Amino acid sequence: MQAHELFRYFRMPELVDFRQYVRTLPTNTLMGFGAFAALTTFWYATRPKPLKPPCDLSMQSVEVAGSGGARRSALLDSDEPLVYFYDDVTTLYEGFQRGIQVSNNGPCLGSRKPDQPYEWLSYKQVAELSECIGSALIQKGFKTAPDQFIGIFAQNRPEWVIIEQGCFAYSMVIVPLYDTLGNEAITYIVNKAELSLVFVDKPEKAKLLLEGVENKLIPGLKIIVVMDAYGSELVERGQRCGVEVTSMKAMEDLGRANRRKPKPPAPEDLAVICFTSGTTGNPKGAMVTHRNIVSDCSAFVKATENTVNPCPDDTLISFLPLAHMFERVVECVMLCHGAKIGFFQGDIRLLMDDLKVLQPTVFPVVPRLLNRMFDRIFGQANTTLKRWLLDFASKRKEAELRSGIIRNNSLWDRLIFHKVQSSLGGRVRLMVTGAAPVSATVLTFLRAALGCQFYEGYGQTECTAGCCLTMPGDWTAGHVGAPMPCNLIKLVDVEEMNYMAAEGEGEVCVKGPNVFQGYLKDPAKTAEALDKDGWLHTGDIGKWLPNGTLKIIDRKKHIFKLAQGEYIAPEKIENIYMRSEPVAQVFVHGESLQAFLIAIVVPDVETLCSWAQKRGFEGSFEELCRNKDVKKAILEDMVRLGKDSGLKPFEQVKGITLHPELFSIDNGLLTPTMKAKRPELRNYFRSQIDDLYSTIKV
């Protein structure tokens, strides 16, 4: 059909008459056309656009030919893992030097006192202080060599990074000590790493170390450097047992008066001995090189290069322990790009205040914090109308997520989610979670509510924090993403649990430049973790999904048999049961002489009372924990969830005891990384376990 025929068909004038036709239209009509055109143009220009993924999201990893089923990131052009993203950054020392340049000597490390703004040190100030500390160490007789270990026993603060960079500038190695490791583990690490000098933040930690020297438990310790103010009695106590107690300021002055030229490390040199807190036995010292850390950082930058682009305008809130590799990798990425790092005040209860003042753009988190945020948001929706609005708004935003759209400027953000976004400072554009599994429900909701790029990672200390990461544009939950560009991942058979690699299931194994060098002075443990071909065996059970992402489905290390011979993986069962609304923590237990499982359940103090009230139960939290009918109702809810999640009948617990006190680091039932200490839990609840087995008849 010709154009003039088309106009005639719709009874419209031909183009030559169009001007005359427009003149005959009423002014209101013309204004309406103009407004419609303007609105259409505005919508087209500002409509939400999905984040462009860096690869085909239906195939995020690729099998490597001749590798026994190993898969690599689809972002790579070859089967060789990525080692360095920037040619001039092959060590953490070089990464910091790059940060000095790209930041144009901008602010680097910030801290604050209560009710005060953040005060900042510039990149060059940090570099100068770092070289002073490193020079002071040399003046004290320490070697510029990758077998020279220096201890850091402190919470996150600017001095932590200054000491770290001071060690790196002169090829020394840092050995972080956890605040919550406990006296025995600290003594073990000081001796294992042969630490003769330890930096501490508070006098109380210096006293703890001096006590070990006085009791001849750590005879090799000779110098303690204290960051905070302390009294003369601490110096005198040290002198009596042959330990020099000095201040951070004195070390800076000593180094300033005796400056040495930096002696940077090689990529293959050790950077950190990261002691992992095992659930049994002594901590193991993972030996991690500069190459390990830089390759892991490079992989994150590669995976997000078109979406995140860290820059000097970014600000990181530092509150997750720097003694853990997750936080260390995040901070190394920030420093390499000239970004700012603001430290929390040291009290997790003041974190929300720190967030409001700092207004970070980058916020790494752990699932425990996400669960609290989720519970708090839904706890505030305390009427039927508020709950309906929250559900409706989250579903609208989750629909956008499924289309790949991430934003924080929708109608629902302004009406519903603005408050929670503002509570984090109002500028967060990047969040990363790792260290433990996170509920798909919680992750999806918070991705929608917070309206920022929110990635989930998976890994462990032995592969320098991360080996898998969710892909930009893939905002689905329930998996840990594809292999990072720095490593390959393969699954191997676990016959005793009926997981077969040929069926896409098995133990997760990792190989690449991010895999550690072994455990310090422990060849037997190293051989358990690293096979002869260099594959790290994680102990986690994974499953390949059709789109090439990995789902963690089980845990190998804590399996046990029941009397009938069935293998049980308790952590998988616990993760399912903890989805129950009134449940905060669960310890699932079984024995080879018993035919069924039981559990110790810690109810959620914030939700139990309201949950019980809806079911007709009244009383305080402690009274409800003693109520047999409440216990029965919670057990029924757990079993329902287990059935819905596909647990086999023998994987379901047959009885529970309600315990009102949370498992914690303080009571010795959790490790510093918040993992259950199963032997300690077994001993702690021995009488309750025996009672359950004696009273339940199956």
From Swiss-Prot:
Positions annotated as glycosylated: 135
GO cellular component: endoplasmic reticulum; endoplasmic reticulum membrane; membrane; mitochondrial outer membrane; mitochondrion; peroxisomal membrane
Underlying gene: ACSL1
Topology term for the membrane: Single-pass type III membrane protein
Modified residues (3'-nitrotyrosine): 9
Keyword flag Signal: no
Organism, as annotated: Homo sapiens (Human)
Gene Ontology BP term (one): fatty acid transport
Xref: CDD domains: LC-FACS_euk (cd05927)
Family recorded in the similarity comment: Belongs to the ATP-dependent AMP-binding enzyme family.
Name of the protein: Long-chain-fatty-acid--CoA ligase 1
Modified residues (Phosphotyrosine): 84
PROSITE patterns per the UniProt record, alphabetical: AMP_BINDING
Reactions mediated catalytically: a long-chain fatty acid + ATP + CoA = a long-chain fatty acyl-CoA + AMP + diphosphate; (5Z,8Z,11Z,14Z)-eicosatetraenoate + ATP + CoA = (5Z,8Z,11Z,14Z)-eicosatetraenoyl-CoA + AMP + diphosphate; 3,7,11,15-tetramethylhexadecanoate + ATP + CoA = phytanoyl-CoA + AMP + diphosphate; hexadecanoate + ATP + CoA = hexadecanoyl-CoA + AMP + diphosphate
